[in-house]
Amino acid sequence: MNYEFKIIAFTNDPQFSISLTRECNKYGFSLSFIDSESEIINELDDKIISVTLLDLNNFQEDPFQLCETIKTDHGIPVFGVLNKFSKHVQERAKKTGFDLIFTKKMLLRSIREVVIHVSNE
């Protein structure tokens, strides 16, 4: 299958991972789950628009530092997801360079629209 859009996800939330996989399959988006920033380079392809999705609640590495590293080293958009909005986390994420922040539920409900928006940027 030829994909035009790829999500590279850092999460250890099994329920969210299953739901995200289901939604990506429904719309034909490529999805990879990785455990470290060093794996991103293997997932990038010049022919495919890629974004990174960082779980702000359930990841062992510091997602804010990870965002800065990804933006500096790879220059791809970084989205943050969390279980429930927190003004403090949202402000910190914005300062760190996250492109967009979603609750997991909101992202799953609107993933198609988000991908269309990012693809048109």
Predicted regions located by residue number:
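Conserved acidic segment of CheY-like receiver
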Residues: E4-P14
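Two-component/phosphorelay signaling modules centered on CheY-like receiver
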Residues: P14-S32
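Acidic, metal-coordinating helix/loop segments flanking the phosphotransfer/catalytic sites
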Residues: D35-V51
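Conserved phosphotransfer microenvironments
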Residues: L53-T69
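Conserved phosphotransfer cores of two-component systems
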Residues: I70-G75
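A short, hydrophobic beta-strand element within the central beta-sheet of small alpha/beta folds
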Residues: I76-F85
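Alpha4 helix (beta4-alpha4-beta5 surface) of REC/receiver domains from two-component response regulators
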Residues: F85-L100
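Receiver (REC) domain switch/output surface
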Residues: I111-E121
